């Protein structure tokens, strides 16, 4: 066997990291990047540079390469594809050996795959479009603390989406008035109320006061309605120690569910909190605040389907996924894709929904998809169709904004049950939605007023991040 010798100097990345004949292993972590190269940098060299800089390569030859098996540990760019309708960029597929990453650490995965390489000068823009996690890696991660079935069993609620409300105004209420708003919404027929993502422990409402008044509201509504209720108590905090302190107090006052901002709070904190929830029988609601900073630019950043996979591995029983019909970004096909990635046990490659790889989750439980952001009763037929039963339909202004106060909690429940009944009868909810709601409103003045109030409200803006699908 020839002995390799060290030769100082600079070589092209493609000599070591571009391997078009490579067949990915079942244990490899696979990535699809969208690369916009700098002028004069060819495709293979740019893809190889990304593979090198996101694994074990650097800009020059180093003598310590001879102290390890570089051929085993390096990332390999193995395929390039055109982006339909955009000749300024292309897809690069890269395979990484599983041993490059610490077991069960999505933090470590992100440190490599979306670390310094995103500032690399050889590329003008770089976006991580998708990841394939092998089952060997999935099994090292904690995943959702409980999952869909366990949550339904805890709540004793089956056969329909769950209903929620984000309390408004999101900032400025006193703890007592905040609790009052929660009580009215829960008593009116909702399953959950929710802290907004930016409610932590501000001077106008300290966290302990909020927790106490809210749980009083939850318990009172439960006694009056005979249904299990809950409120997402946001335990996101300045430090992990303070976060756990708030979680422990939520457990002490018998709260069924807490909440965390997983991107703003950090993936390390989120994984730790998910483990705590698993060990303490607490459900975990996840908000995605900050995601659009990362995922909205179609050429640079991280696609939300990747953030969804990372959250499922890190741990969360609920995740906000957008609405398609509301005020937030997200086209229908892409949204359905990442909803499946959150809930299903196996999701096949489907380019029409932006899914670049098969993803096998094994026995890892799925989480509820949360539809939230600019939705109201007129959206109910579409929401039930798009999201199905394993979802939380979260109306904020669409509950608290009713002319009769929180009467819209009752209106939302009536609209939901009318849609679920019609679906069971085989009716087409989106085509017959207006007739269904009008018939239900004949027996619900609360729903009738809500329909009048929001009949002209639409959010018809063009989606910034469109699926790139080849013409057939």
UniProtKB/Swiss-Prot annotation:
It comes from the Bacteria. One of its GO terms (molecular function) is magnesium ion binding. InterPro entries: RuBisCO, RuBisCo_large_chain_AS, RuBisCO_lsu_C, RuBisCO_lsu_C_sf, RuBisCO_lsu_fd_N, RuBisCO_lsu_N_sf, RuBisCO_lsuI. Keywords: Calvin cycle, Carbon dioxide fixation, Lyase, Magnesium, Metal-binding, Monooxygenase, Oxidoreductase, Photosynthesis. Binds 1 Mg(2+) ion per subunit. The modification N6-carboxylysine is found at residue 194. GO terms for biological process: reductive pentose-phosphate cycle. The active site is at 168 (proton acceptor), 287 (proton acceptor). Substrate binds at residues 116, 166, 170, 288, 320, 372. Mg(2+) binds at residues 194, 196-197. Coiled coil: none annotated. Its cofactor is Mg(2+). It is an enzyme of class 4 (lyase). Its EC number is 4.1.1.39. The record marks 327 as: Transition state stabilizer. PROSITE patterns: RUBISCO_LARGE (PS00157). It catalyses: 2 (2R)-3-phosphoglycerate + 2 H(+) = D-ribulose 1,5-bisphosphate + CO2 + H2O; D-ribulose 1,5-bisphosphate + O2 = 2-phosphoglycolate + (2R)-3-phosphoglycerate + 2 H(+). RuBisCO catalyzes two reactions: the carboxylation of D-ribulose 1,5-bisphosphate, the primary event in carbon dioxide fixation, as well as the oxidative fragmentation of the pentose substrate. Both reactions occur simultaneously and in competition at the same active site. Belongs to the RuBisCO large chain family. Type I subfamily. Heterohexadecamer of 8 large chains and 8 small chains. The basic functional RuBisCO is composed of a large chain homodimer in a 'head-to-tail' conformation. In form I RuBisCO this homodimer is arranged in a barrel-like tetramer with the small subunits forming a tetrameric 'cap' on each end of the 'barrel'. This is Ribulose bisphosphate carboxylase large chain.
